[in-house]
């Protein structure tokens, strides 16, 4: 059975004795920085000139430096920019400021796993990945709880990288819930697979096909939306609370029987074979290569696919129906129906 690491197993003073630069102040960046500071760690924020996040970081009491200056100042550099921007950020601002004894921290292993970033000799490279979005990481920390983390070490030049990684994980509150040891390869490949095959790609396509099937059969779009998208949250919440078993325990006998007899007709064995092909593309680096090449070219495929998704009729139906939901409160910085960030 996997060993779980908790607060009692890690020495917080290790990260408290280091100067930490958090590069990026988005979802994960703000949570890591605030939690570390509340844990007694000296933190500065690294942001490019003109960054829209600068005002927020300064309002929350942080010193903001350029990524280059922050990296030169720090002992521990935490790179929390989007995957596609990390390579350029590292080359332009971080690499030349890395000296023996410093540590690079990532929350996702993409750029290390696929070779887009290579640290110089003498630098530790670690992964501390909370299994939740940044606002949840921060909220749980403030409540005296934590979000579970997975932790890995790619390069242990100092011989003490694991100890510092666990200390960092404790500093952001992750070991209150528990930490699991992994590798950069395992974290990256399973994370991408989960996103593509199940959580994002698989679920989005399943919902769209369900909506289209009901619409093509003559049912009202509003009813179709409720049945294949709106109620999905109710089912996922049950699965989150107690697994598939609790979800099946909570629904009617009719729904449970339909689950058993019709689920395999929709998600048939060939779907599993397709999943294996998706995983193979991830493992071989084919997906990463396709993504980065598209991003380097200005993201034409990415933007075309995003636009196509936004134009699906389920989106216009949803925008109208969500106006009826008194309990629905959108994020302040989100425009309903838009994927663009």
UniProtKB/Swiss-Prot annotation:
Pfam families membership: KARI_C, KARI_N
Reactions performed catalytically: (2R)-2,3-dihydroxy-3-methylbutanoate + NADP(+) = (2S)-2-acetolactate + NADPH + H(+); (2R,3R)-2,3-dihydroxy-3-methylpentanoate + NADP(+) = (S)-2-ethyl-2-hydroxy-3-oxobutanoate + NADPH + H(+)
Residues that, per the record, bind Mg(2+) 2: 191, 227, 231
Active-site residue list: 108
Biological pathway: Amino-acid biosynthesis; L-isoleucine biosynthesis; L-isoleucine from 2-oxobutanoate: step 2/4; Amino-acid biosynthesis; L-valine biosynthesis; L-valine from pyruvate: step 2/4
Domain KARI C-terminal knotted: residue ranges: 183-328
Enzyme class: oxidoreductase
Binding positions for NADP(+) per the UniProt entry: 25-28, 48, 51, 53, 83-86, 134
Cofactor: Mg(2+)
Molecular function GO labels: ketol-acid reductoisomerase activity; magnesium ion binding; NADP binding
Keyword Iron-sulfur: no
NCBIfam families: ilvC (TIGR00465), PRK05479.1 (NF004017), PRK13403.1 (NF009940)
UniProt protein name: Ketol-acid reductoisomerase (NADP(+))
Species of provenance: Clavibacter michiganensis subsp. michiganensis (strain NCPPB 382)
Name of the coding gene: ilvC
């Amino acid at each position: 059975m996997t060993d779980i690491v908790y607060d009692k197993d890690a020495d917080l003073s290790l990260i408290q004795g280091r100067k930490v630069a958090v590069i990026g102040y988005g979802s994960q960046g703000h949570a890591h920085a605030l939690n570390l500071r509340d844990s007694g760690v000296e933190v500065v924020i690294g942001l490019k000139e003109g960054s829209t996040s600068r005002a927020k970081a300064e309002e929350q009491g942080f010193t903001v430096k350029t990524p280059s200056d922050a990296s030169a100042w720090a002992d521990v550099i935490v790179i929390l920019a989007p995957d596609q921007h990390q390579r350029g950020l590292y080359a332009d601002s971080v690499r030349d400021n890395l000296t023996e004894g410093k540590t690079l921290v990532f929350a996702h292993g993409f750029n290390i796993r696929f070779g887009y970033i290579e640290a110089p000799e003498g630098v530790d490279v670690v992964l501390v990945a909370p299994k939740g979005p940044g606002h949840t990481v921060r909220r749980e920390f403030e409540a005296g709880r934590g979000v579970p983390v997975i932790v890995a070490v790619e390069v242990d030049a100092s011989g003490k990288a694991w100890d510092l990684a666990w200390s960092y994980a404790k500093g952001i509150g992750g070991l209150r819930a528990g930490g699991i040891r992994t590798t950069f390869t395992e974290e990256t490949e399973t994370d991408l697979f989960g996103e593509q095959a199940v959580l994002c790609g698989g679920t989005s396509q399943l919902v769209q096909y369900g909506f289209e099937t009901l619409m093509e059969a003559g049912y009202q779009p509003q009813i179709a939306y409720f049945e294949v998208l709106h109620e999905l949250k109710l089912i996922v919440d049950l699965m989150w609370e107690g697994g598939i078993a609790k979800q099946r325990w909570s629904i009617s006998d009719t729904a449970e029987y339909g689950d058993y007899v019709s689920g395999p007709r929709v998600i048939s064995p060939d779907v599993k074979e397709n999943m294996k092909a998706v995983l193979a593309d991830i493992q071989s680096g084919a997906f990463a290569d396709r993504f980065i090449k598209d991003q380097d070219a200005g993201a034409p495929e990415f933007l075309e696919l995003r636009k196509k998704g936004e134009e699906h009729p389920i989106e216009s139906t949803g925008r109208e129906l969500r106006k009826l939901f008194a309990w629905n409160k959108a994020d302040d910085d989100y425009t309903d129906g838009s994927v663009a960030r």
